[in-house]
């Protein structure tokens, strides 16, 4: 059953970095990984932007590897093969940037 609960949160702010990631229409995901969590090599059909908020990630892609820390931004073009490992608890924002959707009236 759908419920709407009002008045539970009266103050809410969005970090300007997160707000800047939001496309005109879309979403930003907050991901939290426990230390040692590995996301095995994979790809995405759309561009992806990750912003490290807390902790550290070992980020690998074909041809490179880097330890990423708070404030680092990772730009992944669609189809980039990559994996990550949380070196300690890590929190990061992910924006998937799909191609523009054409209007049904076109």
Predicted regions and their residues:
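A short, N-terminal "cap"/entry segment at the start of jelly-roll beta-barrel domains
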Residues: 1-31, 40
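Beta-strand residues in well-ordered beta-sheet regions across diverse protein folds
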Residues: 52-53, 60, 85, 94
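Short acidic-glycine-tyrosine-enriched beta hairpin
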Residues: 63-78
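Short, conserved beta-strand element in jelly-roll/cupin
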Residues: 33, 43-59
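Structural motif
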Residues: 49, 56-58, 65, 81, ...
């Amino acid at each position: 059953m759908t419920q709407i609960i009002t008045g539970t949160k009266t103050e809410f702010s969005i970090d300007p970095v997160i707000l800047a990631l939001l496309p005109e229409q879309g979403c930003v995901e907050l991901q939290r990984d426990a230390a040692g969590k590995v996301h095995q090599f994979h790809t995405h059909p759309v561009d992806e932007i990750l912003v490290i908020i807390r902790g550290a990630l070992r980020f690998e892609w074909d041809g490179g590897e880097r330890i990423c820390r708070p404030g680092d931004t990772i730009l992944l073009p669609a189809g980039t093969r990559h994996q990550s490992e949380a070196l300690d608890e890590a929190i990061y924002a992910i924006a998937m940037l799909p191609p523009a959707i054409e209007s049904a009236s076109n």
